[in-house]
C-alpha cells in the first residue's frame, strides 16, 4: 500500500524548477523515500523524460562507492542532460562525506534541480547549513497525521475506534500493512527504534553507554507533556541508581532531537513576548513507539492527546511553544509569521471545575488572537467569551474552521 502524502507532494511541486535545493528531513521510515518516488512519478506524468531523473539511495549497497563525494560528483556530472532540466534525487545524503561540496557544485550549474533527504538534523547543522545558506528550503516530514491515517483506511467513519488504532498501531506508514498483527508491529517499531539508536546516535555521536541513552529516552517518553529539565532527568536517574551528570543528559537530548525521535517545546512568556530557557516540554514522534517502549499500561490519555495535537500543529507549519501567562500555563502557543493561536488540550471539560481551569489561562490573555479548547467530548461546539471549545478529532481531521 502506497499512501499519497498530498500535502508534502504539493510542497515539492510548488518548488519545482525553482533555484533552491529541496531538503526533506524526518525520522527514519516516515515516508521520505516514497514521497520522492511519488514526485518522480508526477514528473514523468507531466512531461519529464526518464533520462532527466537521477535517483540515488545511499542506503542501497549498489551505490555504496558513491558515498565518496568526488565519485558522486563525477557520476552525476556524467548524467546531466544537455539543454534540459535534470532532476537529481539524493536519498539519505548524510551518508556522503562532504556532501555539501557536491550540492554546491551542482547548484551553480544551469538546468539542475536538486532534492535531498536525511534522517537526522545533523545534515543541516550550523557548519553545513552555512555552505548552502540561503539556497535551500527545508520540508520537515512526520509520520501519518490522523487525517492521513483515516483516508488510508478508505473510510472517514468510526473515528473513535480509528483514533485508538492510530495511537496503538503507530503512525508510521508501513504499520498499516501490519494492521491486526500487534507482534509484527512491535517488531517493526523496535527495528526502527534500534536503527535510530545504533546508526544515527551511538555510532555518529560516539556514545559509549547505550543503556544510559535508553534510560534518558524512556524517561522522556514516560513524561511527555510534563515540564522537564536536564537537571531533573539527571537527578531522577541518579536517585534510581543510574548515575549521570547534567552535561551528559543534555548531550543525549540533543542527539535524540537531532534524530527526530523527540521534539522540544520551549516555554514562551505570552505577556512579555520572551522565550524562556527553563522547563520546556518534550513530545514523541509516534505514540505507537512509546507504547512499544513503555507498554500499553502507560496510557496517560490526556498527555497522549496533547502529543498528537502538538505534532499536528508542526505539520500545519507552526512554531509551537508552551505558554506562560502570569502563574498560568497555556498548553500551546502556535505561531506562523504574524499569526498566533492559543490552545488548551483536555480529555473532557464537562466537569465545571475542569472547564474553568482550562479557560482561566486563555481568559488571562488580553489580545485578539484565536483561542481554542480541544477536547474529546462529543458535545456540540460552544464558545466562552470568544474561546471556542471544539472536538479534537474533528480538529485533527480539518473539519472545523
Question: What are the roles of these predicted feature ranges?
Answer:
Residues 24:
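Hydrophobic anchor at the beta1->P-loop junction of P-loop NTPases
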Residues 32:
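Conserved lysine of the Walker
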Residues 35:
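Hydrophobic positions on the alpha1 helix immediately C-terminal to the Walker A/P-loop
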Residues 55-83:
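Short glycine-rich substrate-engagement loop in P-loop NTPases that contacts/grips substrate
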Residues 119-121, 125-227, 260-263:
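Interdomain motor-coupling "hinge/lid" segment immediately C-terminal to the ATP-binding subdomain
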Residues 180-340:
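Accessory nucleic acid-recognition modules appended to NTPase machines
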Residues 378-401:
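Domain-level recognition of nuclease-like catalytic cores that cleave nucleotide substrates
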Amino acid at each position: 500500500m502506497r499512501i499519497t502524502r498530498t500535502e508534502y507532494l504539493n510542497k515539492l511541486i510548488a518548488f519545482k524548477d525553482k533555484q533552491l535545493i529541496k531538503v526533506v528531513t524526518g525520522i527514519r521510515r516516515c515516508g521520505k523515500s516514497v514521497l520522492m518516488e511519488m514526485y518522480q512519478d508526477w514528473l514523468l506524468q507531466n512531461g519529464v523524460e526518464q533520462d532527466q531523473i537521477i535517483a540515488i539511495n545511499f542506503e542501497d549497497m549498489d551505490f555504496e562507492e558513491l558515498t565518496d563525494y568526488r565519485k558522486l560528483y563525477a557520476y552525476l556530472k556524467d548524467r546531466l542532460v544537455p539543454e534540459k532540466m535534470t532532476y537529481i534525487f539524493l536519498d539519505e545524503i548524510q551518508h556522503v562525506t562532504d556532501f555539501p561540496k557536491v550540492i554546491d557544485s551542482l547548484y551553480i550549474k544551469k538546468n539542475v534541480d536538486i532534492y535531498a533527504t536525511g534522517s537526522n538534523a545533523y545534515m543541516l547543522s550550523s557548519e553545513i547549513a552555512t555552505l548552502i545558506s540561503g539556497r535551500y528550503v527545508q520540508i520537515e516530514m512526520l509520520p501519518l497525521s490522523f487525517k492521513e491515517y483515516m483516508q488510508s483506511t478508505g473510510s472517514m467513519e468510526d473515528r473513535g475506534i480509528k483514533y485508538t488504532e492510530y495511537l496503538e498501531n503507530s503512525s508510521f506508514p508501513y504499520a498499516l500493512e501490519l494492521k491486526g498483527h500487534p507482534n509484527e508491529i512491535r517488531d517493526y517499531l523496535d527495528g526502527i527504534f534500534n536503527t535510530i539508536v545504533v546508526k544515527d546516535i551511538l555510532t555518529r555521536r560516539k556514545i559509549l553507554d547505550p543503556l544510559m541513552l535508553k534510560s534518558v529516552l524512556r524517561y522522556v517518553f514516560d513524561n511527555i507533556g510534563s515540564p522537564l529539565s536536564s537537571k531533573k532527568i539527571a537527578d531522577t536517574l541518579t536517585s534510581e541508581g543510574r548515575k549521570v551528570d547534567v552535561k551528559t543528559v543534555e548531550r543525549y537530548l540533543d542527539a535524540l532531537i537531532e534524530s527526530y525521535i523527540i521534539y522540544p517545546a520551549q516555554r514562551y512568556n505570552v505577556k512579555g513576548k520572551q522565550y524562556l530557557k527553563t522547563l520546556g516540554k518534550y513530545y514523541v514522534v509516534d505514540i505507537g513507539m512509546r507504547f512499544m517502549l513503555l507498554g500499553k499500561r502507560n496510557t496517560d490519555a490526556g498527555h497522549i492527546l496533547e502529543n498528537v495535537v502538538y505534532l499536528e500543529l508542526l505539520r500545519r507549519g507552526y512554531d509551537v511553544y508552551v505558554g506562560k501567562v502570569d502563574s498560568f500555563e497555556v498548553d500551546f502557543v502556535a505561531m506562523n509569521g504574524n499569526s498566533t493561536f492559543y490552545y488548551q488540550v483536555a480529555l473532557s471539560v464537562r466537569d465545571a471545575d475542569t472547564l474553568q481551569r482550562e479557560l482561566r489561562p486563555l481568559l488571562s490573555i488580553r489580545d485578539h488572537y484565536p483561542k481554542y479548547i480541544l477536547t474529546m467530548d462529543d458535545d456540540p461546539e460552544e464558545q466562552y467569551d470568544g474561546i471556542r471549545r471544539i472536538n479534537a478529532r474533528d480538529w485533527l481531521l480539518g473539519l472545523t474552521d
